[in-house]
Amino acid sequence: MRKFLLFSLLLTSFTSLAQSSLADSIRLILEEGIAADAFPGAQVLALHKGEVLAHVTAGHHTYANHRPTQKDDVYDLASITKTSSGLLYLMQLYERGRVDLDAPVGQYFPVFAGTNKADIPLRSVLSHRAGILPWVPYWQGTLKGNGRYPWKKSWDTQRTNDYRFRGRTFQRDSSRNYPIRVMDDLWMYRNFRERSIYRAIRKSPVKPAGNYAYSGLLFYLLPQLVEEGTGVGYHAYLREQFYDPLGAETLGYRPLDRGIPLSKIVPTEIDTFFRMATLHGVVHDEGAALMNGVSGNAGLFSSAADLAKLYQMLLNGGEYGGRRYFKESTIGEFTRRHYEAEGNHRGLGFDKPLVEYDPDASSVAEAASPTSFGHSGYTGTMVWADPGTDLLFVFLSNRVHPSRNRRAIYTLGIRPRIHALLYRHLVEVGNH
């Protein structure tokens, strides 16, 4: 008995030391990124079999170093929204037999009906190989032809009134027809979504299918699909079906409207070409901003722990906290590769490891199993779940602060290097 107790104590001590060493190694890479101006601050949360391996923070909210990064900080998730919001509703419809993944998208999305995209299979669109445009810079179409164009020159942020907007787009003050706040001095026309965004998506060109080309256009249409299919507001439906039962309190849209203190939200870019302000508590993505901050493309905010709850549920095969959200087969269908023979590595909405690993192009470790899945975000975020090792990796940063031109997070391979540390740790402690 004494030998068993001694062995247990030694094993516990070894595990604690190993986890401490892991945290120190993660922190060193984060600090390397901060020193290289990859981001002013960041955090990593890693779980194995649902238990925390490490939760490491480094740096500050901005380079002014006024507020240190804290574990419960809330981040703009950017494109992690794609797999954390409206796609979950599509998964529900599929599970209930109400969506055929090989049916044409025009059957489910009225905006696509009668267009050059109407007959494209939904499976092809979700796998990013349908030839649809990656994105549309909707806001640029709001400027008059003789308006000053800040992308092409140094812009004086104090001269925002130099903008000349087309009718029924923006104005400087709110009114009955311009009730949607984008910024304090920028209010959007009430039907802008239908008049401009949906119209631009309908008219957008299509290239031949078969080549991988990341596109976010379908995800702009998911809020309408949810609201028309459920009779419930988009965000309200997601909260009711997923976020609230998971206990993911910070996960959601428009954080300031939900009472999250501005001091807990990490700022993103100092916008010098559209909103002319530091983006803090409002969505970074321009397209999502024009959707009133609520889109299937971008717009979600969350802490690391709350984002982890959603992906731990997916990693568990659809179950979390004694409640089943999806069948395991549904998650398997959406997180597997569908066009691997074409060299396409994507699942349905979800990102996957490259078919052939390329260290210069991958955001995940080479050790990530073919069954693993997740998504990254333009603001410097990533979440990755690996059923092969029962490992969950959450990386949150604001790499676009103060400017989206900061690229060191990619050139230094910050995320895949930290991800690789986690796999090596599992091998070293024998918990693979």
State the predicted function of each range:
Residues 1-21:
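Bacterial Sec-dependent N-terminal signal peptides
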Residues 20-77, 98-100, 199-202, 278, ...:
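Short, conserved catalytic-motif segment at the N-terminal edge
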Residues 32-45, 64-127, 205-218, 295-298:
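Short active-site loop at a secondary-structure junction
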Residues 43-45, 54-55, 76, 124-127, ...:
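Structural recognition of the beta-strand scaffold that forms the well-ordered cores
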Residues 55-58, 135-141, 253-255, 396, ...:
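Short, solvent-exposed loop/turn and secondary-structure capping segments
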Residues 117-370:
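Short, surface-exposed loop or secondary-structure junction motifs
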Residues 375-432:
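Structured C-terminal helix/loop/strand segments within mature extracytoplasmic catalytic/sensor domains
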